[in-house]
Amino acid sequence: MGNENVVHEGKGIGFFERYLTVWVAACIIVGVAIGQLLPAVPETLSRWEYAQVSIPVAILIWLMIYPMMLKIDFTSIVEATKKPKGIIVTCVTNWLIKPFTMYLIAAFFFKIVFQNLIPESLANDYLAGAVLLGAAPCTAMVFVWSHLTKGDPAYTLVQVAVNNIILLFAFTPIVAILLGITDVIVPYDTLFLSVVLFIVIPLVGGYLSRKYIVQSKGIEYFENVFLKKFDNVTIVGLLLTLIIIFTFQAEVILSNPLHVLLIAVPLTIQTFFIFFLAYGWSKAWKLPHNVASPAGMIGASNFFELAVAVAITLFGLNSGATLATVVGVLVEVPVMLTLVKISNRTRHWFPEVAREN
């Protein structure tokens, strides 16, 4: 029985997923090479930006999110709201724990461990950038991580929606308290544009597509034929996004390699810590894997568009705080893909079906 399960699981892994580590490494190399050897490419792409949101990246994120939105049965959203445990895990982890552990971990590394490598003023800037990341849980990419771990799409949507509502009110006071800054300005155009681009548009598109296909072709065709056409769309979109991100940041990586690595250390540790905290809590509460995995992923990943925009507004484009938020962008995808792999390999820790979420 055990061997059959292993064989079945191996067959279920697609070509892209099986060699995802190789593809990610290749995309990072390609992205940095393009940014360095063909500087006109990132320069041209950077013109297609509004409210700190890259339009090319937004299009690719649509490609990644759309397949998951197709799977949402909207009657299940109402059911998801009746099972609050997964939402409680997400909200408590994201808003009562994550910002403060980010501050402590980042301060420990920047001000103590790396004090001989980073000047004090720069350490304070890096700490500020880390806090901005820690106070902004993910809005868009969490749908990708949920999709890759077979998360419940309807429940993930509810988790993200609740976090976005809290974000509107909690981000500013948390950042102000941790950084001692009273004039924190939240770029609401970035916030609202991201919600519209990365949640509302894919959600409406998925709903209309699902409704049309089911009515015209039937639910069996939709689930067994139509959905399968999108099997590799998310992975391809993810890899192309990775190339664009590293194309944009090639100069930062090559001009500050040591500081990029130093900043990446506490950000990576924080990401793993928050994921395992929420994931372990979900296991203790006997939540199903398709709720536990997204709960861990939302807190582990960050709303980097918002963090970068606030860093630029408060500290300036060339500040250490902005560099720290940019490094957050660089490490997020490779680290989150590692967590996706861990989540998929520990699926057997969780009950198949939970009576109460």
Swiss-Prot record:
Biological-process GO terms, alphabetical: response to arsenic-containing substance
Subcellular location field: Cell membrane
A GO molecular-function descriptor: arsenite transmembrane transporter activity
Membrane topology: Multi-pass membrane protein
Keyword entries, A-Z: Arsenical resistance, Cell membrane, Membrane, Transmembrane, Transmembrane helix, Transport
InterPro entries associated with the record: Arsenical-R_Acr3, BilAc:Na_symport/Acr3, Na+/solute_symporter_sf
TM regions (residue ranges): 22-42, 50-70, 94-114, 126-146, 165-185, 188-208, 233-253, 260-280, 297-317, 320-340
Domain of life: Bacteria
UniProt GO cellular component terms: plasma membrane
Residue intervals annotated with topology Cytoplasmic: 1-21, 71-93, 147-164, 209-232, 281-296, 341-357
Pfam families to which the protein is assigned, alphabetical: SBF
Residue intervals on the Extracellular side: 43-49, 115-125, 186-187, 254-259, 318-319
Keyword Signal listed: no
Family stated for the protein in its record: Belongs to the arsenical resistance-3 (ACR3) (TC 2.A.59) family.
Function: Catalyzes arsenite efflux from the cell.
Protein name, entry field: Arsenical-resistance protein Acr3
Gene name per UniProt: acr3
